[in-house]
Every structure is written in structure tokens, then in C-alpha cells.
Curated annotation (Swiss-Prot):
Belongs to the plant LTP family. GO terms for molecular function: lipid binding. The gene is LTP3. Disulfide bonds join 33-81, 43-58, 59-104, 79-118. Residues 1-29 form the signal peptide. GO terms for biological process: lipid transport; response to ethylene; response to hydrogen peroxide; response to salicylic acid; response to wounding. Expressed in phloem. Also detected in the epidermis near the vascular tissues in resistant plants infected by Hessian fly larvae. Keywords: Disulfide bond, Lipid-binding, Signal, Transport. Induction: Up-regulated by Hessian fly larval infestation, salicylic acid, ethylene, H(2)O(2) and wounding. Not induced by methyl jasmonate. It holds the Pfam family Tryp_alpha_amyl. Plant non-specific lipid-transfer proteins transfer phospholipids as well as galactolipids across membranes. May play a role in wax or cutin deposition in the cell walls of expanding epidermal cells and certain secretory tissues. This is Probable non-specific lipid-transfer protein 3. It comes from Triticum aestivum.
């Protein structure tokens, strides 16, 4: 896979936090930032404005990540990864980020925002 620049990784992590907060099942393995980045890499072009439409590969990654984010600790870790990387990225379109789960058929029961407190993610 091509090496992702920090802007691309941050955009992927922003999207990851959104997806990870919605799963409710328990899992035994911890989710890693590497897994998040890998699943969401196809979404980077869309959420940074380099693509006008969301790709099937992006939605596949979002749905796959939703399946991996089964425990509260996994979702909290992903949220923290997102915040540590995404705060330095200014070109992310949060309107597009917040719309990705819905466009991919994944339901998020709360507003998507960079102000999300990762400690409150369940």
C-alpha cells in the first residue's frame, strides 16, 4: 500500500472515530490505529475534497471498521488516535466526514464532532 501522508492519516482517523463510536458488541482483541488507517484510507480523497463522491471501497472500509469496533475500549482508543492526528489537519471537511457513515449505510446515533470527549465514548 502506498505510504499515507499525515494529512491523509488524520482524515482517516477522523472518520474512524465516527465509525468506532457506534458498535456495541464486545471483542477480545484491541483495535489499533493501523487497522483504522487501513480500513479508512479509501475515504481520504472524499473527506479532503479531492474526490467529489464517496467510493465503494470507502464504504466497504467503514462497514468493516464498524464490525471491528466491538468494545468500548476499542472505540475510545480509536477516538484518541483520531484526536491526536486530526488536530493538525485544517483541510478536512467535517461536513463530509459526518455524512460518510450515512452514505455507507451505517447508523450513528449522535452528532459527529471533533469536540467529542473520547472518555465518554461507549
Amino acid at each position: 500500500m502506498a505510504r499515507l501522508n499525515s494529512k491523509a492519516v488524520a482524515a482517516a482517523v477522523v472518520l474512524a472515530a465516527v465509525v468506532l463510536m457506534m458498535a456495541g458488541r464486545e471483542a477480545s482483541a484491541a483495535l489499533s490505529c493501523g487497522q483504522v488507517d487501513s480500513k479508512l484510507a479509501p475515504c481520504v480523497a472524499y473527506v479532503t475534497g479531492r474526490a467529489s463522491s464517496i467510493s465503494k471501497e470507502c464504504c466497504s472500509g467503514v462497514q468493516g471498521l464498524n464490525g471491528l469496533a466491538r468494545s468500548s475500549p476499542d472505540r475510545k482508543i480509536a477516538c484518541r488516535c483520531l484526536k491526536s492526528l486530526a488536530t493538525s489537519i485544517k483541510s478536512i471537511n467535517m461536513g463530509k466526514v459526518s455524512g460518510v457513515p450515512g452514505k455507507c449505510g451505517v447508523s450513528v446515533p449522535f452528532p459527529i464532532s471533533m469536540s467529542t470527549n473520547c472518555n465518554n465514548v461507549n
